[in-house]
Amino acid sequence: MSDSIQERYLVGYALAAKKQHSFIQPSLIEHSRQRGIDLVKLDPTKSLLEQGKLDCIIHKLYDVYWKENLHEFREKCPGVPVIDLPEAIERLHNRVSMLEVITQLRFPVSDSERFGVPEQVVVMDSSVLSGGGALGELKFPVIAKPLDADGSAKSHKMFLIYDQEGMKILKAPIVLQEFVNHGGVIFKVYVVGDHVKCVKRRSLPDISEEKIGTSKGSLPFSQISNLTAQEDKNIEYGEDRSLEKVEMPPLSFLTDLAKAMRESMGLNLFNFDVIRDAKDANRYLIIDINYFPGYAKMPSYEPVLTEFFWDMVTKKNHV
């Protein structure tokens, strides 16, 4: 059916320049166009009510004016999906409220697969870090992460802390999370509405009891990534053959988990990082949740996103 007679839908996007460059690829534009969906760039400084007859809005902007703009649009056009609502997104900007999502899930208990989150404590006072009580019941080594998870460079600055000496580099507020050996593999689960895809990535290598006893201080994650094989620097996304033999978590388990998370958070676009406990192959831990991740890195992202857009503009299903 030609574009001239096919019913067409308008999906507006409001993204930061870097995000727009990585996400709005020509291949995605063409995939969507062939399905009858036109992707149009929105001007966040102007009223959304003056930018055409929109059938759906996707966004990843957080300033106050944009939130007010969205609020006005939602009041005047309540039937148009806004993906996603700012108040729902904000929950993921704090690493405590982020993982509380998981602990509060109502999810059927399975004998074969169990899930949870690593033990963690929050330190709000930097003076506590220099003492010996910051860890609570945790034991070294621990992972130190900034409390804020707003996507800034600062929020990605993490450390593996081996001992009390390593704590000196940290500043509050910060989250201290137990380190769980997981075979050096992380599973990144991409959620796009009802669509779920999982990929394997290299992660922090396991730490032996011997190494725990001899390692000192701290290591930033950028250095830890260099501890794995030399050839890692030449490995592109999805091309690490050393991971081929690593078994994926059951897709049915991940799909059910993603659905429960989606409904609990009220979000359609996110990914979550999962590790498998090296001591218990049926125990999975969710360690991070990100809103509107780098979907262009996901294999075959164009048809997945196009199908999601179609679901949204035809009002099939969104939270």
Swiss-Prot record:
The modification N-acetylserine is found at S2. 1D-myo-inositol 1,3,4-trisphosphate binds at K18, K60, H156, K188, N290. The keyword Protein biosynthesis does not apply. Belongs to the ITPK1 family. One of its GO terms (biological process) is inositol trisphosphate metabolic process. Its EC number is 2.7.1.134, 2.7.1.159. GO terms for molecular function: ATP binding; inositol-1,3,4-trisphosphate 5-kinase activity; inositol-1,3,4-trisphosphate 6-kinase activity; inositol-3,4,5,6-tetrakisphosphate 1-kinase activity; magnesium ion binding. It catalyses: 1D-myo-inositol 3,4,5,6-tetrakisphosphate + ATP = 1D-myo-inositol 1,3,4,5,6-pentakisphosphate + ADP + H(+); 1D-myo-inositol 1,3,4-trisphosphate + ATP = 1D-myo-inositol 1,3,4,5-tetrakisphosphate + ADP + H(+); 1D-myo-inositol 1,3,4-trisphosphate + ATP = 1D-myo-inositol 1,3,4,6-tetrakisphosphate + ADP + H(+). Mg(2+) 2 binds at D288, N290. Binds 2 magnesium ions per subunit. The keyword Heme does not apply. Residues 99-318 form the ATP-grasp domain. InterPro entries: ATP-grasp, Inositol_tetrakis-P_1-kinase, InsP(3)kin_ATP-grasp, ITPK1_N. This is Inositol-tetrakisphosphate 1-kinase 1. Mg(2+) 1 binds at D273, D288. Gene3D superfamilies: ATP-grasp fold, B domain. Keywords: Acetylation, ATP-binding, Kinase, Magnesium, Metal-binding, Nucleotide-binding, Transferase. SUPFAM superfamilies: Glutathione synthetase ATP-binding domain-like. Expressed in siliques. Its cofactor is Mg(2+). Kinase that can phosphorylate various inositol polyphosphate such as Ins(3,4,5,6)P4 or Ins(1,3,4)P3. Phosphorylates Ins(3,4,5,6)P4 at position 1 to form Ins(1,3,4,5,6)P5. This reaction is thought to have regulatory importance, since Ins(3,4,5,6)P4 is an inhibitor of plasma membrane Ca(2+)-activated Cl(-) channels, while Ins(1,3,4,5,6)P5 is not. Also phosphorylates Ins(1,3,4)P3 on O-5 and O-6 to form Ins(1,3,4,6)P4, an essential molecule in the hexakisphosphate (InsP6) pathway. Monomer. ATP binds at residues 95, 145, 177-188, 203. Disruption phenotype: Low inositol hexakisphosphate (phytate) levels in seed tissue. It comes from Arabidopsis thaliana. The gene is ITPK1. The lineage of its organism: Eukaryota, Viridiplantae, Streptophyta, Embryophyta, Tracheophyta.
